[in-house]
Amino acid sequence: MQDNALTIALSKGRIFEETLPLLAAAGIAPTEEPEKSRKLIIGTNHENIRLVIVRATDVPTYVRYGAADFGIAGKDVLIEHGGTGLYRPLDLEIAKCRMMVAVRKGFDYEAASQPGCRLKIATKYPEIAASHFAGKGVHVDIIKLYGSMELAPLVGLSDAIVDLVSTGNTLKANGLEAVEHIVDISSYLVVNKAALKTKYALLEPIIQSFGGAVKAKWAFI
């Protein structure tokens, strides 16, 4: 990467949409909408700043290895896949949700999750799930899925799921209920440590702008 250029790693969807006001606070505007473009590299109103659109789980990897100078990553991704080797200066307080355990309505989770019991857990967060239940002394068989998590308890694939919950509407629509909170999730600014040194003059104003925008947002709530 050039010393006078910045590459920002972002994922499509909610994180991108909620990052736009932060980018605007730093005077950065994408030239295209990722949801409407097939391009994976998108320019901005600054010739030396570009966005790379990657999977949410890949953002820390792009930043850690220097393919991007900084990015926005969910706490769930940082916990599950590791945030080592990254500078994490800000909790941006965006894309907020909760990591929860959910079961079919009527399932006696309290009795089934006593120390020494065994549960089948479907999730795309095996590390988080395993750590949580190990802390409770519960034995688990982890079944890794990549989507439609709510289906697993309904067809007998699992006793419970571990997944992100925002409104809870999807759980309710499928006859499930959240029964245990694991961790609150939001998205963080993650910065490549080498870039922070070599591109400090470019990065620091953006970090400060992001921080100011986060504080201003909560000042009005």
Curated annotation (Swiss-Prot):
Enzyme class: transferase
Function: Catalyzes the condensation of ATP and 5-phosphoribose 1-diphosphate to form N'-(5'-phosphoribosyl)-ATP (PR-ATP). Has a crucial role in the pathway because the rate of histidine biosynthesis seems to be controlled primarily by regulation of HisG enzymatic activity.
HAMAP family on file: HisG_Short
The species this protein was found in: Neisseria gonorrhoeae (strain ATCC 700825 / FA 1090)
Keywords per UniProt: Amino-acid biosynthesis, ATP-binding, Cytoplasm, Glycosyltransferase, Histidine biosynthesis, Nucleotide-binding, Transferase
InterPro entries: ATP_PRibTrfase_cat, ATP_PRibTrfase_CS, ATP_PRibTrfase_HisG, ATP_PRibTrfase_HisG_short
Name of the protein: ATP phosphoribosyltransferase
Domain remarks in the Swiss-Prot or TrEMBL record: Lacks the C-terminal regulatory region which is replaced by HisZ.
GO CC term, one of those recorded: cytoplasm
Stored PROSITE patterns: ATP_P_PHORIBOSYLTR (PS01316)
Subunit record text: Heteromultimer composed of HisG and HisZ subunits.
Molecular function terms from GO: ATP binding; ATP phosphoribosyltransferase activity
GO annotation (BP), single: L-histidine biosynthetic process
Family statement drawn from the similarity comment of this UniProt entry: Belongs to the ATP phosphoribosyltransferase family. Short subfamily.
Alphabetized Pfam families for the sequence: HisG
Pathway entry: Amino-acid biosynthesis; L-histidine biosynthesis; L-histidine from 5-phospho-alpha-D-ribose 1-diphosphate: step 1/9
